[in-house]
Amino acid sequence: MSLLLTIAKEYKRLCQDAKAAQMMTVGTVSNYTTFKKWTTSRKEKNPSLRMRWAMSSKFPIIANKRMLEEAQIPKEHNNVALWEDTEDVSKRDHVLASASCINYWNFCGPCVNNSEVIKEVYKSRFGRLERRKEIMWKELRFTLVDRQRRRVDTQPVEQRLRTGEIKDLQMWTLFEDEAPLASKFILDNYGLVKEMRSKFANKPLNKEVVAHMLEKQFNPESRFLPVFGAIRPERMELIHALGGETWIQEANTAGISNVDQRKNDMRAVCRKVCLAANASIMNAKSKLVEYIKSTSMRIGETERKLEELIPETDDVSPEVTLCKSALGGPLGKTLSFGPMLLKKISGSGVKVKDTVYIQGVRAVQFEYWSEQEEFYGEYKSATALFSRKERSLEWITIGGGINEDRKRLLAMCMIFCRDGDYFKDAPATITMADLTTKLGREIPYQYVMMNWIQKSEDNLEALLYSRGIVETNPGKMGSSMGIDGSKRAIKSLRAVTIQSGKIDMPESKEKIHLELSDNLEAFDSSGRIVATILDLPSDKKVTFQDVSFQHPDLAVLRDEKTAITKGYEALIKRLGTGDNDIPSLIAKKDYLSLYNLPEVKLMAPLIRPNRKGVYSRVARKLVSTQVTTGHYSLHELIKVLPFTYFAPKQGMFEGRFFFSNDSFVEPGVNNNVLSWSKADSSKIYCHGIAIRVPLVVGDEHMDTSLALLEGFSVCENDPRAPMVTGQDLIDVGFGQKVRLFVGQGSVRTFKRTASQRAASSDVNKNVKKIKMSN
C-alpha cells in the first residue's frame, strides 16, 4: 500500500509540469517496448527476435510528418494504414508509420532520375565492370603455382594518396570551417582541394557519400594477397579468378576504355625500348628500329605491332617522339625538354653558342636562340605560356596545377630559355663528372642543370631565386607567384603570373618529318633538336602484362619471374649433342665459351647488380671444380651457369645466388626456382613449371637412357673413363671405355666392341634369350 502511495505522489508531482503531464497522459509511454527501451541498459540477448517482434506491430517505425505531407503520402492506401497522426514521444515532429509506408514510397512515390548520380557515386565499381568485359580469356592450365603473399594494389586510381592525405582532403573539401590546420599536403595541393570542391558543388549528394567517393578515387585499396605473375592493379582485382594452388587461367587484362592508362603503357614501352637501344654502344638507331618492329601490344581483343601504334598516337612525349623519328613518321610542331612537353606557337630562333664556367675554371659551351619565340609548356597538372628571347625568359603565365608542379614547370622553362645566373657560372656542386654519361658520352649543360634541380629542393629554390624577387603589387595579389608556387605571396618572382584555370594547348596542323641520329637525338630539317634520350625521365620498374617483346635482347623486360623461367628453359635446351651445346663444351673444358653462351648473356640482367661479380667468381669456381674432378651434375651446372657471365670479383658469399626480384637458387638444394627429382631425370621444374630435358642421343622417340651408337655397348659406370663428345667417338679404339652424355642429364660409360654393333642389338639379343628360356 505504501508503494502505491509513493507512486501516486510522484505522479502528482510530475503532472504539475504541463509538458510532463502531456507525455504521461498522451502517446505510447505505456507501450512495453518503448518503456523498456528508456528504462533499462541491459544488453538485448536476442536482438533479431526483438526486431521481428517489434516490426510485427501496426506502426513500428517513425517518419517526419512534414516530409510525408510534401510527398503526398496518404494515411491509408488500399485499406492498408500507412501512418497515423500520432506524435512519437521520443522525437519531435515525427509520427508513427507502418512498414507499408516504405513500400508505397518505393512504388508509388515521386519519380527521380538518379542514374547519373549513381554512376558518379559508384564510378569505381562501374569501372571494374567495364574492365572485366574487356578481358580476353585464354586456356586453363593445371600445374603447381608458386604464389607469394605480397602487398598489392587492387584498384587502379588516377592519383594515389596515403590514408592521412585522403582524410585531410575529405575534411578540407567537405568541412572547410571545421577542418584542422592545413598540413604540408594541403598547402602543396590546395589546387586539388579547389578542384574537388567545384566538382561536387551543387550536386544532390550528402557529405557521407562524397567522402566515400573521394576515398575510392584516391585509395588503391592495398591488400596482402597470395599472388603470381604481374601485379598490375587491373590484374590484382580479379586475381582470385586467375589461379589457385594447382591451376592457372591465362587472361589478358588491358583496359581499352582507360585512355590515360593506354597512353601511360605506350610511354612506358617506348621508354623501355629507347633505354635498351641506348645501352648498345654501336648502332643505337638500328637497334631501336629492331626493338620497335619486334614488339607488340594488345589493344582490346587484337594484338597489334608497336610500329603500327606509334604513328597513330598524338602523344608528344620524348620517348614516343624518338620512336616516331626512328620510324620516319610525321610529327606536329612539338618538342620535348626533359619531362616537360612543349609546342611552339610563334617565332623562329637563330642558334647561338655561349660559354659557362664549371667551378670557375673549365669553360663549357652551350647553345641558345637569339630571336623571340613563344611556347606552350605542360608538366603534370600545370600548364604555361611563355616567351623567350636571347638568354632570358621574358614572361610566363602558369595555369592550374598544384604548387609543386608550378615550381618545377617554371624551373624547367628557365633552363629551356637559358635564364638566370647559373648560365654564366655553374653551381659550385656541379663537377666535371656530371658532364658525361657512364658510357663516356657528353651531356649538354642544360641537361646537367635539369639533373641538378632534381637532386634536392634547395637546388630547385636556388634556381628560382636567380630569377629575381620583387615586391608584389597589392592590386595583383593572387595573380603573382611566390617562391613556393603559391598565389598570395608578399614577394613574388619577376614577370611570373598565375591564372586559375588550365591553359589549353593550341592546335597545330603543320606536320614535320624528323631524323634520328645514332646518339638518339631527334632533329628537324633545320637541325633543331626536338627530343633526345636525355629527355627521358628516370626509368621506373614497370611490369608488362599485355606486351610481347620478341627480340632476344628485350627478354629481361618481361616479368622477371617469367624471364627467369624462359632463361632456364633456353639453357636446358642446350643439353644436346652439338659442338656448341653444354655437354660438348664441358667435355672440351671450353669454359670461356660456356660462360658466354647467348642464353647465359640473356639472363645476366636478372642478376642482383651489386653482387654479380662475387656470384660470378663463386659460380665459375663451382663449375670448373666439378668438371675437373669429374663428379658433377648437369642439373647443378645449369643452376649456376646464369651467374658466370660477369667478370669475377672478390667478396663475401652468403651461400645463395640471388636474382634481382629477390628469388634465389642454392647449390645442392632444390627450391621453388629450380628443382628436379633423381627418380625422374626427364623434367626440371622452374617456378613450378615442368621443362622437359632433351631425350637420348640418336633416337628422339625412345624414352630410355641407352645410347644407340654403332660399335659401342653400354657397360658399368667407370668414372676413370675420359669424357668425350659425339664427334670424338670415331677416334676411340677397340676395347676402350669412354663417357658420353646421352640426354636427360645422364652420363653413361661406353665400350668399343665392334665396328657395326650398337646397344640396341644387345637389347634385342637379351629379349630373344628371355623368350627362348620361356
From Swiss-Prot:
<keyword id="KW-0507">mRNA processing</keyword>
<dbReference type="GO" id="GO:0006351">
    <property type="term" value="P:DNA-templated transcription"/>
</dbReference>
<keyword id="KW-1157">Cap snatching</keyword>
<keyword id="KW-1195">Viral transcription</keyword>
<dbReference type="GO" id="GO:0075526">
    <property type="term" value="P:cap snatching"/>
</dbReference>
<comment type="similarity">
    <text>Belongs to the influenza viruses PB2 family.</text>
</comment>
<dbReference type="InterPro" id="IPR049111">
    <property type="entry name" value="Flu_PB2_middle"/>
</dbReference>
<keyword id="KW-1262">Eukaryotic host gene expression shutoff by virus</keyword>
<dbReference type="GO" id="GO:0039694">
    <property type="term" value="P:viral RNA genome replication"/>
</dbReference>
<protein>
    <recommendedName>
        <fullName>Polymerase basic protein 2</fullName>
    </recommendedName>
</protein>
<dbReference type="GO" id="GO:0039657">
    <property type="term" value="P:symbiont-mediated suppression of host gene expression"/>
</dbReference>
<keyword id="KW-0946">Virion</keyword>
<comment type="function">
    <text>Plays an essential role in transcription initiation and cap-stealing mechanism, in which cellular capped pre-mRNAs are used to generate primers for viral transcription. Recognizes and binds a wide range of cap structures of target pre-RNAs which are subsequently cleaved after 10-13 nucleotides by the viral protein PA. Plays a role in the initiation of the viral genome replication and modulates the activity of the ribonucleoprotein (RNP) complex.</text>
</comment>
<dbReference type="GO" id="GO:0044423">
    <property type="term" value="C:virion component"/>
</dbReference>
<comment type="subunit">
    <text>Influenza RNA polymerase is composed of three subunits: PB1, PB2 and PA. Interacts (via N-terminus) with PB1 (via C-terminus). Interacts with nucleoprotein NP (via N-terminus).</text>
</comment>
<dbReference type="Pfam" id="PF00604">
    <property type="entry name" value="Flu_PB2_5th"/>
</dbReference>
<dbReference type="InterPro" id="IPR049106">
    <property type="entry name" value="Flu_PB2_N"/>
</dbReference>
<dbReference type="Pfam" id="PF20947">
    <property type="entry name" value="Flu_PB2_1st"/>
</dbReference>
<keyword id="KW-0945">Host-virus interaction</keyword>
<dbReference type="InterPro" id="IPR049114">
    <property type="entry name" value="Flu_PB2_6th"/>
</dbReference>
<dbReference type="InterPro" id="IPR001591">
    <property type="entry name" value="INV_PB2"/>
</dbReference>
<dbReference type="Pfam" id="PF20949">
    <property type="entry name" value="Flu_PB2_3rd"/>
</dbReference>
<dbReference type="InterPro" id="IPR049113">
    <property type="entry name" value="PB2_helical"/>
</dbReference>
<dbReference type="GO" id="GO:0042025">
    <property type="term" value="C:host cell nucleus"/>
</dbReference>
<dbReference type="GO" id="GO:0003723">
    <property type="term" value="F:RNA binding"/>
</dbReference>
<dbReference type="Pfam" id="PF20952">
    <property type="entry name" value="Flu_PB2_7th"/>
</dbReference>
<dbReference type="Pfam" id="PF20948">
    <property type="entry name" value="Flu_PB2_2nd"/>
</dbReference>
<keyword id="KW-1104">Inhibition of host RNA polymerase II by virus</keyword>
<dbReference type="Pfam" id="PF20950">
    <property type="entry name" value="Flu_PB2_4th"/>
</dbReference>
<dbReference type="InterPro" id="IPR049115">
    <property type="entry name" value="Flu_PB2_C"/>
</dbReference>
<dbReference type="InterPro" id="IPR048298">
    <property type="entry name" value="Flu_PB2_CAP-bd"/>
</dbReference>
<dbReference type="GO" id="GO:0003968">
    <property type="term" value="F:RNA-directed RNA polymerase activity"/>
</dbReference>
<keyword id="KW-1190">Host gene expression shutoff by virus</keyword>
<keyword id="KW-1048">Host nucleus</keyword>
<dbReference type="Pfam" id="PF20951">
    <property type="entry name" value="Flu_PB2_6th"/>
</dbReference>
<dbReference type="GO" id="GO:0006370">
    <property type="term" value="P:7-methylguanosine mRNA capping"/>
</dbReference>
<dbReference type="InterPro" id="IPR049110">
    <property type="entry name" value="Flu_PB2_2nd"/>
</dbReference>
<keyword id="KW-1191">Eukaryotic host transcription shutoff by virus</keyword>
<dbReference type="GO" id="GO:0039523">
    <property type="term" value="P:symbiont-mediated suppression of host mRNA transcription via inhibition of RNA polymerase II activity"/>
</dbReference>
<keyword id="KW-0506">mRNA capping</keyword>
